[in-house]
């Protein structure tokens, strides 16, 4: 019994050393991503996955993403309206590909890891939204996740909208919105009604795109909430520390 106990203790120490090495590598990779000129959203999401799955092979994920992108691209053409583009993308992702939206549950950390969302074809609003935006980025569709409270909403902007140069109210440059959980489109009036139900006055901030860095920061913060048991305190602290690297 003593021998097995000592053996288990040694094994745990070895596992913690390996985990710490992986974590240090992940810290460095995240800093490199943060400081790079272009913050690729898929790469950022894969870094979050590698916290729990450090040996994750990325090639199958990239292949899955490319299959979806190509299926959508084949259905798109320059004559489609933005709403028609959204309908094509949502139809392929949520019907043909059969992506499902699930409620946020901190009991299921896999729902926050992009490779698991692709593998199991189900994700919560945040991960489905990130996947949707990745597709829009790859297809040159000007659609971004915005700052609507308690929701993950994708705004389809006018093709000439650029958040870095636009001076007016960003809502004026939005055609419509898509619910990341289901892929369904809805109108400005629907958003106005939502703010009324919250008794909240909408501001320009709510309609600005979230940066890729901000999205990955939020994703890390959400994953951290999955590790709130005493045995996982160190993981929660590490995830919060990673999130704090992103401003």
Model regions: which residues?
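A structural boundary/capping signal
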Residues: 1-247
